[in-house]
Amino acid sequence: MDTSDEDIAGTEERPMAARFQLVIDCADPEPLARFWAAALDYELEPPPDGFATWDAYWRDLGVPEEELGTGADRIVDPSGRAPRIWFQVVPERKAVKNRLHLDIGVSGGRAVPIETRRQRVDAEATRLADLGALLVGVHETEGLDHYAVAMEDPEGNEFDIN
């Protein structure tokens, strides 16, 4: 069958690039949102125009009272380039290793001397530990010119700094 004239991927029906948000399951969204906003230089997402708070917005949409959160459950990149992150309340606690994690790049890459990269990574790890993160381990492979640290956010979600 000749498919040369067909749009197999369906791009004709998708006039713009797909956008996504990252969703992080958690027990208490507000402190986790504040942690990650500080970690990533994000900010808490302001309520939509015309609303003083997220609660007012959700109530206007008819969301039941028992489903309302604090409103401080989503963060955005102030530049608008990186994805929005939403912190979703779930009843269960984290039980196993994440299948997806964030890497926070602060070292400058391999063009930067390893000692400088190590200092940058360690300084960021200290900053995030002061915000509530836990240092889990150091990844340094001799001969591979690589240095990173593994950490957990305040609810135990793994992330790396490199």
Where are these regions (language model features)?
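Short, Lys/Arg-enriched N-terminal segments with co-localized hydrophobic residues
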Residues: 2-15
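Eukaryotic partner-binding/assembly regions in large regulatory complexes
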Residues: 34, 44-52
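Hydrophobic ligand-binding cavity/cleft-lining segments
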Residues: 15, 27-38
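Vicinal oxygen chelate
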Residues: 13-24, 40, 47-49, 59-66, ...
